Amino acid sequence: MEERKQKVVVVGAGPVGSLAALYAANRGHDVEIYELRGDLRDPSTTPLNFTRSINLALSERGLNAMRHANQPRLIDYVKGVTIPMRGRMIHGKRPDGKLYEEAQDYDIHGRSILAIDRGDLNKRLLDMLEEMPNVTFFFNHKLTGADFKRNKAWFENKDESTSNPRDRAREIEVDFDFMIGADGAHSAVRYHLMKFSRMDYQQEYIDTLWCEFQIAPSSSSAKSKFRISPNHLHIWPGKEFMFIAIPSNDGSFTCTLFAPAAIYEQLEEAGRTGDTSSSIPEFFDMHFPGVTSLIAPADLIAQFQTNPHLPLISIKCKPYHFSSSVVIVGDAAHAMVPFYGQGMNAGLEDVRILFDILDKHDRMTNDDSSLEASQRELALAEYSAVRVADAHAINDLALQNYIEMRSSVLSPVYRWRKALEEWLSVYVPSLGWQTKYSRVSFGNERYSEVVKKSERQGQVLLRSLVGGVGLPMLAGGLFLWFRYKGALGRAAYGVFYNCMGMVCRTIHGRRR
């Protein structure tokens, strides 16, 4: 659609910021992208989180956002570089000492999520933006100030270093019609937005650190370069920690150890003191059986000692905008822990929803610039109203999924509910029944609606279970009471009464 040209400033050149710039540029706006780091395509640039390889799970929401960017080459590229993961592969050890693998498909209909290298996707988006004449990059520029009432921002150019280290780099002033903040969890745009908007803000570091490891490609097999199945997200679950592995195109796997800070301290201390009984390989053999056959013990130690041990942050805030001048998206608005694989997907979806709402309000304007600004203000207010509830919902789901991944995947109750919901999805499709994971990862309905529907399904299953157990118990209790009215009958009725009480308390507790 043809729109009036505006100057859009995007702060942050990661995947979310780059997609936002692509959306804006496709609408004919003049786009300037400001990035704190150097060009992310330069190998010398320090990557996100100081790691070289971050594999992510790309699902329908992220793909849908890229489809709406009207860049068929982008979708073709994604199809060519991603690896489909159809489910989880749970690793463990049986009581007899034998190792096992157990596949758990994500979806009974055979749908998959895609493993993709974050850096490669980012580079591709930047390459596409560089081809557009109305896009300009400003790398090594730090946002130092903003006046969102006057639509002005100030950036420090770190490229122009001074001879005196105490002197500040040169600062430039930038005018804009509209700013999009996509500069991550520690967002400078959000920091300055708080000075203009009465923003509610909540930040939490969970008691879990993460460290990256690598499983190298196979050099001995002529059939496959992958040493374990490439079409699964591999999980070594533990009650308090877990180890995961995600495939890469070169045959390697990017692995992550998630564990409480106390565990990391113990392993670090063992490394310093040379305590072999609690060393890193012994820890892996005890809790993640089979990993030391995929990563040599010496490599495990080296990677643990070399790669950073990083925290996980969860952020909620509202609103996401001020007036008609600024909005935040992605981690700047809702940083979440990575356990649902939705962080990047939610950020990319932010962009699609934001521009859908902007387009809707743009159709209500004419050439009057003041009317244009007022409509954009209404659009940003609508975006905040719509998106906050969904962002908070997926933020909570991500925290809950950590428990599922590290322990519930082994639970018979978890497997029973998943199997029953999938059976209903296939054999009684008129009910519209789906697992929560399928709704989140393979659909585009609002996260908040997914939560509501999943809770309703859980209540129905619980009532059905209670009905299936409780009615036979009631019939049995009445039979015993009338058949044996003496002491035996009273004793049997007492057992029945207590059991029914437990069922009722279970229902009451679940509803709360």
UniProtKB/Swiss-Prot annotation:
E.C. designation(s): 1.14.13.9
Keyword Aminoacyl-tRNA synthetase annotated: no
GO CC annotation: mitochondrial outer membrane
Compartmental location: Mitochondrion outer membrane
Catalytic reactions of this protein: L-kynurenine + NADPH + O2 + H(+) = 3-hydroxy-L-kynurenine + NADP(+) + H2O
Pathway: Cofactor biosynthesis; NAD(+) biosynthesis; quinolinate from L-kynurenine: step 1/3
Cofactors demanded by this protein: FAD
Pfam family for this entry, one: FAD_binding_3
GO molecular function, one term: FAD binding
Secretion signal, residue range per the UniProt entry: none
Top EC group: oxidoreductase
Biological process annotations from GO: 'de novo' NAD biosynthetic process from L-tryptophan; anthranilate metabolic process; kynurenine metabolic process; L-tryptophan catabolic process; quinolinate biosynthetic process
UniProt keyword annotations, A-Z: FAD, Flavoprotein, Membrane, Mitochondrion, Mitochondrion outer membrane, Monooxygenase, NADP, Oxidoreductase, Pyridine nucleotide biosynthesis
Entry-linked InterPro entries: FAD-bd, FAD/NAD-bd_sf, Kynurenine_monooxygenase
Principal place of residence: mitochondrion
Keyword set includes Nuclease: no
Protein task: Catalyzes the hydroxylation of L-kynurenine (L-Kyn) to form 3-hydroxy-L-kynurenine (L-3OHKyn). Required for synthesis of quinolinic acid.
Family statement drawn from the similarity comment of this UniProt entry: Belongs to the aromatic-ring hydroxylase family. KMO subfamily.
Name this protein carries in UniProt: Kynurenine 3-monooxygenase
